[in-house]
Design a protein with these regions (language model features):
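Non-catalytic interaction-recognition regions
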Residues: 1-226
């Protein structure tokens, strides 16, 4: 490849680096252009978007911007599924698995992001309250979430150095898990301790910001409502 690029007259030929990827199968059937067994990506996107739209119609028929959200979740599900595997591994794509809102998937990550938005919107008058500079005894879920948030720069560097997008997707899933455990075990809006409430709002706000940036790194949109 570098030699071909050099012959084409480009001076960056000696800076090229081959990044190998595994093969892709759909429901166990290997794709191959030589045999004509090809499924276009745009067709996969269309199927995923329609399936998500049907789910949204059933779960929340009065939802606003349903078409935009369905496209973001449907396309994001496929992108996330592909990038969640180590790039050298062969992938068997199963649509139902990719669209599972309860699994280690793009929709699960997007739903978690939407959850942070919902919490902060309900607490809009308090969302920008600064965390008091006092010593607080943290719950385990608060400590775990804080630690997960702090790992973001390190994981991005790992992904860049190894040219491995799955490092970011795995981090996203870890962060979502940490936030959802925190959400289930630590009251936020109903917390009566003002200092703890401010801390929990700050953790939620930080999760929204970092999760949003992480999803953007892998080109997955993050609607505020799903």
């Amino acid at each position: 490849m570098p030699s071909a690029v050099e012959l084409m007259g480009y001076d960056f030929y000696n800076k090229l680096y081959h990044v190998p990827y595994g093969t892709v199968s759909i429901n166990g059937e290997k794709l191959a252009t030589r045999t004509g067994n090809v499924i276009l990506l745009r067709d996969l996107f269309s199927v995923a978007v329609e399936k998500v739209r049907a789910i949204m119609e059933e779960k929340n028929p009065n939802m606003q911007n349903k078409d935009e959200s369905a496209e973001a979740v449907g396309v994001g599900a496929i992108v996330f599924y592909y990038l969640s595997n180590s790039r050298i591994k062969d992938i068997n794509f199963i649509m139902e698995d990719a669209l599972d809102f309860n699994g280690n998937t793009g929709p699960y990550a997007q739903y978690t992001y939407a959850r942070t938005c919902s919490v902060l919107n309900k607490l809009s008058d308090e969302a920008n309250v600064s965390v008091p500079k006092v010593s607080l005894t943290l719950e385990k879920a608060e400590r775990d979430l804080s630690k997960s948030l702090s790992l973001f720069p390190e994981k991005v560097s790992e992904a860049i150095n190894a040219m491995e997008p799955s490092t970011v997707t795995r981090y996203i899933l870890d962060l979502c898990g940490a936030f959802n455990r925190f959400y289930q075990s630590c009251a936020i809006s109903s917390c009566e301790d003002a200092d703890k409430k401010a801390l929990r709002i700050a953790l939620t706000r930080s999760t929204k910001n970092i999760l949003g940036k992480a999803l953007e790194l892998i080109c997955v949109k993050h609607p505020e409502k799903i």
